[in-house]
Amino acid sequence: MAGNRNEEMVYCSFCGKNQEEVKKIIAGNGVFICNECVALSQEIIREETAEEVLADLAETPKPKELLDILNNYVVGQDRVKRALAVAVYNHYKRINFTESREDNDVDLQKSNILMIGPTGSGKTYLAQTLARSLNVPFAIADATSLTEAGYVGEDVENILLKLIQAADFNIERAERGIIYVDEIDKIAKKGENVSITRDVSGEGVQQALLKIIEGTVASVPPQGGRKHPNQEMIQIDTKNILFIVGGAFDGIEDIVKQRLGEKIIGFGQNNKAIDDESSYMKEIVAEDIQKFGLIPEFIGRLPVLATLEQLTVDDLVRILTEPRNALVKQYQTLLSYDGVELEFDQDALEAIASKAIERKTGARGLRSIIEEVMMDVMFEIPSLEDVTKVRITKEAVDGKAAPVLETA
């Protein structure tokens, strides 16, 4: 009987242990592997992946190189681009420094970033461009959709799920990614005094975000949504994730004026020019942000403050034409596939920029304006074989005339 038992015993093809010495043995095509060897294999793969990620980060571009990359895609905002280049370089240098030295008594803090600037000034695009240039996973979240645990809405952990998905569920890569949280000003407390009642979309969300921003091992539901008992969770350490948060902070310039001892512009007085408003934005300090409604602990985890300026007509015209993937170049490429040249008059470009400013959409509104102007042209051109050139005039932008079509 004993001999029969040995003949029926299954052994791991890798470590030689039998089925009684381990918890489980998985059968394959003529081979067997035990749970212990599976766990060891996973650990080896995890370590090798982490080494590959660190090797990639060791080649992080220097601040000047990052600035050159940003300049290829982003027009203006020179102060902000320099600040971001330094902060991002220091962040990944910190990761390399921490990982490469064991008994190190110097604790380098994260360089998380707070960007303040009007709608359409380039906050999201700057963050996207940085992540793309570094080849790291990137996720965007809207703070207004977040609620603290226990309320209807999105848990803050779901932000981390977006990053994990962007990293193709490679946790090591995700743990060194970048998360951009937009509309952060919309979760400001209403006033400086702490509310007695629970603040679902204000301080409570700030407290929840604070934990993952400062660094914690978070449990993330793999399918998103709310956490449920007995649900298997993904564990992710956020200590090396770079958080960039942004918002318009409408009205914060009045708080700055009060602090500086100047009267707030009221009825019967002329509004300040954009240049004056921009100068106030440059004076923003942590005290002003706290008065606006962000809690001190949250502000303290965002040491790098970058304020973006309102884009002018000249800035928007440059955005339309200069960057590597400028909108004008994109539409010229589209029409070139139909064998047609596309040209914008200078005053047409200025009219497009002026419309974006009037609509208070900034750079993000430029594409929709061009679409309005180009819609009929893009509909007709593929069927008009004799057209060789399309010229967009100011009158076409203003809706007073059709674009000029030139034929062979």
Swiss-Prot record:
<keyword id="KW-0479">Metal-binding</keyword>
<feature type="binding site">
    <location>
        <begin position="118"/>
        <end position="125"/>
    </location>
    <ligand>
        <name>ATP</name>
    </ligand>
</feature>
<protein>
    <recommendedName>
        <fullName>ATP-dependent Clp protease ATP-binding subunit ClpX</fullName>
    </recommendedName>
</protein>
<dbReference type="InterPro" id="IPR038366">
    <property type="entry name" value="Znf_CppX_C4_sf"/>
</dbReference>
<comment type="function">
    <text>ATP-dependent specificity component of the Clp protease. It directs the protease to specific substrates. Can perform chaperone functions in the absence of ClpP.</text>
</comment>
<dbReference type="GO" id="GO:0051082">
    <property type="term" value="F:unfolded protein binding"/>
</dbReference>
<keyword id="KW-0862">Zinc</keyword>
<dbReference type="InterPro" id="IPR003959">
    <property type="entry name" value="ATPase_AAA_core"/>
</dbReference>
<feature type="binding site">
    <location>
        <position position="34"/>
    </location>
    <ligand>
        <name>Zn(2+)</name>
    </ligand>
</feature>
<feature type="binding site">
    <location>
        <position position="12"/>
    </location>
    <ligand>
        <name>Zn(2+)</name>
    </ligand>
</feature>
<comment type="similarity">
    <text>Belongs to the ClpX chaperone family.</text>
</comment>
<dbReference type="GO" id="GO:0051301">
    <property type="term" value="P:cell division"/>
</dbReference>
<dbReference type="GO" id="GO:0046983">
    <property type="term" value="F:protein dimerization activity"/>
</dbReference>
<dbReference type="GO" id="GO:0009376">
    <property type="term" value="C:HslUV protease complex"/>
</dbReference>
<dbReference type="Pfam" id="PF10431">
    <property type="entry name" value="ClpB_D2-small"/>
</dbReference>
<dbReference type="GO" id="GO:0140662">
    <property type="term" value="F:ATP-dependent protein folding chaperone"/>
</dbReference>
<dbReference type="InterPro" id="IPR003593">
    <property type="entry name" value="AAA+_ATPase"/>
</dbReference>
<dbReference type="Pfam" id="PF06689">
    <property type="entry name" value="zf-C4_ClpX"/>
</dbReference>
<keyword id="KW-0143">Chaperone</keyword>
<comment type="subunit">
    <text>Component of the ClpX-ClpP complex. Forms a hexameric ring that, in the presence of ATP, binds to fourteen ClpP subunits assembled into a disk-like structure with a central cavity, resembling the structure of eukaryotic proteasomes.</text>
</comment>
<dbReference type="Pfam" id="PF07724">
    <property type="entry name" value="AAA_2"/>
</dbReference>
<dbReference type="InterPro" id="IPR004487">
    <property type="entry name" value="Clp_protease_ATP-bd_su_ClpX"/>
</dbReference>
<dbReference type="InterPro" id="IPR050052">
    <property type="entry name" value="ATP-dep_Clp_protease_ClpX"/>
</dbReference>
<dbReference type="GO" id="GO:0008270">
    <property type="term" value="F:zinc ion binding"/>
</dbReference>
<feature type="binding site">
    <location>
        <position position="37"/>
    </location>
    <ligand>
        <name>Zn(2+)</name>
    </ligand>
</feature>
<dbReference type="InterPro" id="IPR046425">
    <property type="entry name" value="ClpX_bact"/>
</dbReference>
<feature type="binding site">
    <location>
        <position position="15"/>
    </location>
    <ligand>
        <name>Zn(2+)</name>
    </ligand>
</feature>
<keyword id="KW-0067">ATP-binding</keyword>
<dbReference type="GO" id="GO:0016887">
    <property type="term" value="F:ATP hydrolysis activity"/>
</dbReference>
<dbReference type="InterPro" id="IPR019489">
    <property type="entry name" value="Clp_ATPase_C"/>
</dbReference>
<dbReference type="InterPro" id="IPR027417">
    <property type="entry name" value="P-loop_NTPase"/>
</dbReference>
<dbReference type="InterPro" id="IPR010603">
    <property type="entry name" value="Znf_CppX_C4"/>
</dbReference>
<feature type="domain" description="ClpX-type ZB">
    <location>
        <begin position="1"/>
        <end position="53"/>
    </location>
</feature>
<dbReference type="GO" id="GO:0005524">
    <property type="term" value="F:ATP binding"/>
</dbReference>
<keyword id="KW-0547">Nucleotide-binding</keyword>
<dbReference type="GO" id="GO:0051603">
    <property type="term" value="P:proteolysis involved in protein catabolic process"/>
</dbReference>
